[in-house]
Design a protein with these regions (language model features):
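Glycine-centered tight-turn and secondary-structure capping sites
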Residues: 25-30, 70
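FKBP-type peptidyl-prolyl cis-trans isomerase
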Residues: 7-12, 29-36, 60, 74-91
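Well-structured core secondary-structure elements of compact alpha/beta domains
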Residues: 1-25, 40-56, 85-92
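Short beta-strand-initiation
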Residues: 3, 70-71
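Acidic-histidine catalytic/liganding microenvironments
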Residues: 26, 36, 67
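Cell-wall glycan
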Residues: 55-69
């Protein structure tokens, strides 16, 4: 199994909650990632490319396993901070 995902990574839970609300109201995920994410992937609108099991921290991978392609996670906490994840592809 492989996934392709984009994410917005921030250190502040309140900011993550606010960004998730904006995404749910139709704001551009890519634009919010470029503006707010602290991950180097922000230059690609949050795109992390394809990855398989064991390549991401457990909380991130578990969220990807539960998402269907095109859907967005709730705020996911990891050792890196707070993620909003959008699954953009999956290969079973």
């Amino acid at each position: 199994m492989e996934w392709r995902a984009s994410h917005i990574l921030v250190k502040d839970k309140r900011l993550a909650d606010e960004l998730l609300k904006r995404v749910k109201r139709g704001a551009s995920f890519e634009a919010l990632a470029r503006k707010h994410s602290i991950c180097p992937s922000k230059s690609r609108g949050g795109d992390l490319g394809w990855f398989g099991p064991g390549k991401m921290v457990a909380a991130f991978e578990n969220a990807c396993r539960r998402l269907s392609s095109g859907s967005t996670s709730d705020v996911v906490s990891s050792s890196f901070g707070y993620h909003i994840i959008r699954l953009t592809g999956r290969k079973d």
